[in-house]
């Protein structure tokens, strides 16, 4: 599976040059586009539930999916999950999330070690005191044996306390001590880099190592990843841990990662959202895609532009139509992506009145300007910048939906036929 299958825009700033890492065929870093990944919240030992959620995340556009491997039952389930997913046509790479006993689980379950595409190691809890380096080395040696990459994932909530204490003591002895926050940031960065250096000394290539350093505050995340980017060329996994629920989590993650991505920092992202009760786990994938697409780094799905509404648009018709078109696009994208290559570049405008409606509609591939309050009950439609018709009557929404479907068929279906004919 290749992440190159989705369109990639040129980056407005030079991308930080990192070493590319292949994760089950998906390239993270190097010149590859920023990869979207996610994580399940099922009990991995529950094969049916985990397969269903991984499949849903993959269909939504997650290019890598992480699963918890926390005990023998979970490790034993991994090859079954991998096999079931492949039978269903989901070749998405699976990452094993290990804490505390990862070295033991990988040794005791070789089929699990083989089935996973990457191992996540947390330096803060891989082992303690004299066992730490040995157990870290055990996992790295497993990665070498099975030719797997690792993510060395530092998290401020489980930071190596010995390292933090050492840096705090040194700072206390210094003439111009840093703040506790600055020492914490330095400890996070050092934990990642020391662990990466140790992995390389053991024999793991730099093209097998991805680093992450997750914190829960936006300014800390920006500072920590900026430091990491300056001190190494390892591929970087961005994520704001414990971002929270709903709007708060989306805004915090987007603010932090948007700034880093704009500076060319970051090779793969996960937006960690706390699901609302009964919420859809795939929401985090959608938000990740929308962040990258809004910033112009990648294209995943056609853009539907719609005005926010004002006193001129007291009717909800344009809002309902915009939502219907967006939902229809999302529902059909898994099929359209295969059937109509390039369709993710489509732009659609659904506008609510005469002020900006015609202009915005002309700039879209296909757009409609619905009548505002007091305007003539008609809706001009523009295709490729030219007015092609005016819709009237109670079926304006249905008529425009059909025009969008016909446009996709005629434009992107024709492109595919021409390409097939040339071959």
UniProtKB/Swiss-Prot annotation:
The pathway this protein participates in, as annotated, is: Isoprenoid biosynthesis; isopentenyl diphosphate biosynthesis via DXP pathway; isopentenyl diphosphate from 1-deoxy-D-xylulose 5-phosphate: step 5/6
Q: Name one Pfam family in it.
A: GcpE
Binding site residues for [4Fe-4S] cluster: 307, 310, 353, 360
Q: Give me any GO biological process, just one.
A: terpenoid biosynthetic process
Q: Which domain of life is it from?
A: Bacteria
Q: What is its EC number?
A: 1.17.7.3
The protein's required cofactor(s) are namely: [4Fe-4S] cluster
Q: Does the keyword Cytoplasm apply?
A: no
- What does the UniProt record say this protein does? Converts 2C-methyl-D-erythritol 2,4-cyclodiphosphate (ME-2,4cPP) into 1-hydroxy-2-methyl-2-(E)-butenyl 4-diphosphate.
By what name is this protein known?
4-hydroxy-3-methylbut-2-en-1-yl diphosphate synthase (flavodoxin)
Say which species the protein is native to: Brucella anthropi (strain ATCC 49188 / DSM 6882 / CCUG 24695 / JCM 21032 / LMG 3331 / NBRC 15819 / NCTC 12168 / Alc 37)
């Amino acid at each position: 599976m290749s992440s190159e299958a989705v369109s990639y825009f040129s980056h407005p700033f030079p991308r930080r040059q990192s070493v590319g890492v292949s994760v089950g065929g998906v390239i993270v870093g190097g010149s590859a586009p920023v990869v979207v990944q996610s994580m399940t919240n099922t009990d991995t030992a529950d094969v049916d539930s985990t397969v269903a959620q991984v499949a849903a995340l993959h269909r939504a556009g997650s290019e890598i999916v992480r699963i918890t491997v926390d005990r023998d039952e979970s490790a034993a389930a991994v090859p079954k999950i991998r096999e079931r997913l492949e039978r269903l046509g989901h070749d998405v790479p699976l990452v094993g999330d290990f804490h505390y006993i990862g070295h033991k689980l990988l040794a005791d379950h070789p089929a699990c070690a083989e089935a996973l595409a990457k191992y996540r190691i947390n330096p803060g809890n891989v082992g303690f005191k004299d066992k730490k380096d040995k157990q870290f080395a055990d996992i790295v040696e497993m990665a070498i044996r099975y030719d797997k990459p690792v993510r060395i994932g530092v998290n401020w909530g489980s930071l190596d306390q010995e390292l933090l204490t050492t840096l705090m003591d040194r700072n206390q002895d210094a003439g111009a001590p840093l703040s506790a926050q600055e020492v914490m940031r330095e400890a996070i960065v050092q934990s990642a880099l020391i662990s990466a250096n140790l992995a390389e000394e053991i024999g793991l290539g730099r093209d097998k190592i991805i680093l992450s350093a997750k914190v829960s505050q936006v300014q800390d995340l920006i500072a920590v990843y900026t430091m990491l980017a300056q001190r190494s060329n390892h591929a970087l996994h961005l994520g704001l841990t414990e971002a929270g629920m709903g709007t708060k989590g989306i805004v915090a993650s987007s603010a932090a990662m948007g700034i880093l991505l704009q500076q060319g920092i970051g090779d793969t992202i996960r937006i960690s959202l706390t699901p609302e009760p009964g919420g859809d786990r795939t929401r985090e994938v959608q938000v990740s895609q929308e962040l990258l697409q809004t910033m112009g780094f990648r294209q995943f799905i056609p853009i539907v532009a719609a005005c926010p509404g004002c006193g001129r648009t007291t009717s909800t018709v344009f809002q309902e139509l915009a939502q219907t078109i967006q939902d229809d696009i999302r529902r059909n994208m898994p099929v359209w992506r295969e059937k109509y290559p390039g369709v993710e570049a489509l732009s659609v405008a659904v506008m609510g009145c005469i002020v900006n409606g015609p202009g915005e509609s002309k700039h879209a591939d296909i757009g409609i300007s619905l009548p505002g309050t007091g305007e003539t009950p008609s809706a001009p439609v523009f295709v490729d910048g030219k007015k092609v018709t005016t819709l009237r009557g109670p079926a304006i929404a249905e008529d425009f939906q059909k025009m969008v479907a016909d446009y996709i068929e005629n434009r992107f279906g024709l492109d595919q036929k021409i390409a097939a004919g040339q071959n």
